Each structure stands twice: as structure tokens, then as C-alpha cells.
Design a protein with these regions (language model features):
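Conserved ABC ATPase "signature" region
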Residues: 122-140
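Conserved ABC transporter NBD signature motif
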Residues: 68-78, 86
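Conserved ABC ATPase signature
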Residues: 144-148, 152
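Catalytic Walker B motif of ABC-type/P-loop ATPase nucleotide-binding domains
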Residues: 169-172
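Helix-to-loop junction immediately C-terminal to a conserved catalytic motif
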Residues: 60
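ABC ATPase nucleotide-binding domains
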Residues: 240-276
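The feature captures the beta-strand-to-loop junction immediately N-terminal to the Walker
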Residues: 45-47
Length: 276
């Protein structure tokens, strides 16, 4: 079942010329068409400037199309009357965890979104407790947000998105500023959320994260270069080179060891070796 439909999407930014007039500037997305299935886990990758984060902002209406359409759960993101419907269905978690905290106390920060929906206090309490437990931060619910590490702050940002009860969460490079331990924690949470039926869209430049998705969309110069399963993509070295990407470490180990191509993650490889 289609949850997000992107039809010939174009995003153009304008600039001011020397005479002070607004003129066409960069075309960030150029004719993007794709569908996101409900309950899927999709990774979007590409070099810097490929259009990844711009596309992410289109999924919940932060950016309106210059041309084309983005339909979310049946609602057109270009129609202002439907923006609230879109944003209730699609939550977002951004790259910088330090810029996403709006309250001084952990549980107050997670409650911020539901409070703005006008939800009853008892229901907010249930949602906040549930969200914090799901990201492993319940024990720190009454702590000062300023005392948290970057990884902990990112988990709080994810809890805030969960508390809104969206059908989909877009993660825009959520691990870019985290250490390996923080990255692993966030990826574990994303996999768990997807296992519960939440549609997850991961924007990332880490191929080791993309390989954990059901599907990988590769962008280059604002266009879709390819749309494949991780197994298909990481078995095509020529495509990886065209996209300006690097093979995940697990794939490099697999190839050097002469292991079967269907093994795409470190866990796959470990399980295969253990059974030999």
C-alpha cells in the first residue's frame, strides 16, 4: 500500500541578482518520481548536494514543490489546508541533536508536541512514558536536557517524534554527529520502530546504515540514479562508483573472503560463518 507518492517533483530555489531582482537559482530536485510503501524501511543516499535533505523536507511539507506533487496518506503537501494532516502523519528527526531540544527537562521536551495537539494530560503522560521507554530514556525523564550526551539528545528527539504517534518518521542524517556507540543505538531504535509497523525513511551518508534498509534510493544531482534493494545495489560496484559512494565495510569483507553475494550486513556474515 502506497503511503507517500512523489510525482515528477521539482524543487527550485531563487536568488537575488545584482539589481535586487529575484531570479531562478539552483534546481535541487529535478523530476523525482517514487513511491514509499506503508510500513517499509527506505534509505536515501547520495553525495553531498545530491538532494537528500531537500527530499526529506518534502515528505512532510516543510518544502512545497516548485512543480510536481507529493501525496502523503492521500493529502497533497502543496495544499495549505492539508499541511497539518501531513505533519501529523509524518514526523521528522534532524541531524543536529542540540538544535531539537525545546525544553529544559527531558519529559517536558517529549510532551511538547502532544501538548500542541491539545491532547488530554493523562494521554500525554501515557505517550511520554511510552516513548521514553521505547528509546531507553525513561530513567532520565526528570533530568535536565542540557546534561545529556549527543546520542541521548538524539534519542529524546526520536521520543518526541514517537509521542506524536505518526505513521512515518523521516530521519535526516540522525547519526551524522554521533560516535559509533550513539550511531548503533539510534539505528537499533529505527529498526525496532519499523518492526512495529512505522514507515521509516533514513537519509544517510553511511552505507553501513543504508544496507540495513529494505530498499535504497540513490540520488545524484537532484535525480534518482537508482532504486534497488541493498543486495542489488551493493553487488553493483559500477553503480556505487557512479554515485560517488563507498562500499559498506561488511561488503568489502564479504568480497575479500569470497562469501556469497546475498550476505549484505555484518550480522548476515556472522550468522553465515557461524553455521559453516
Amino acid at each position: 500500500m502506497k503511503f507517500i507518492e512523489v510525482k515528477n517533483l521539482k524543487i527550485e530555489f531563487t536568488k537575488i541578482d545584482e539589481s535586487g531582482r529575484e531570479v531562478p537559482g539552483k534546481t535541487a530536485l529535478d523530476g523525482i518520481s517514487l513511491d514509499i510503501e506503508k510500513g517499509s524501511f527506505v534509505a536515501v543516499v547520495g553525495m553531498n548536494g545530491s538532494g537528500k535533505s531537500t527530499l526529506a523536507k518534502c515528505f512532510n511539507g516543510l518544502l512545497a514543490p516548485s512543480a510536481g506533487r507529493v501525496i502523503v496518506g492521500g493529502f497533497d503537501t502543496a495544499e495549505e489546508a492539508h499541511i497539518w494532516d501531513v505533519r501529523c502523519r509524518v514526523g521528522m528527526v534532524f541531524q543536529n541533536p542540540y538544535n531539537q531540544i525545546v525544553s529544559s527537562i527531558v519529559e517536558d521536551d517529549v510532551a511538547f508536541g502532544p501538548e500542541n495537539l491539545g491532547i488530554e494530560p493523562k494521554e500525554i503522560r501515557r505517550r511520554v512514558d511510552d516513548a521514553l521507554k521505547r528509546v531507553g530514556m525513561y530513567e532520565l525523564r526528570d533530568k535536565g536536557a542540557h546534561m545529556l550526551s549527543g546520542g541521548q539528545k538524539q534519542r529524546i528527539a526520536i521520543a518526541g517524534a514517537i509521542a506524536m504517534r505518526p505513521e512515518c518518521i523521516v530521519f535526516d542524517e540522525p547519526t551524522a554527529m554521533l560516535d559509533p556507540k550513539g550511531r548503533a543505538s539510534v539505528m537499533s531504535i529505527i529498526r525496532d520502530l519499523n518492526a512495529e509497523g512505522i514507515t521509516c525513511i533514513l537519509i544517510t551518508h553511511f552505507m553501513s546504515e543504508a544496507e540495513q534498509a529494505d530498499r535504497v534510493i540513490v540520488l545524484k544531482n537532484g535525480k534518482v540514479l537508482c532504486d534497488r534493494t541493498p543486495e542489488e545495489l551493493f553487488s553493483d560496484k559500477e553503480m556505487i562508483e557512479r554515485a560517488g559512494l563507498e562500499m559498506p565495510p561488511a561488503i568489502e569483507i564479504r568480497d575479500k573472503a569470497g562469501l556469497p553475494e546475498h550476505l549484505t550486513t555484518a550480522d548476515d556474515i556472522a550468522d553465515y560463518i557461524a553455521k559453516q
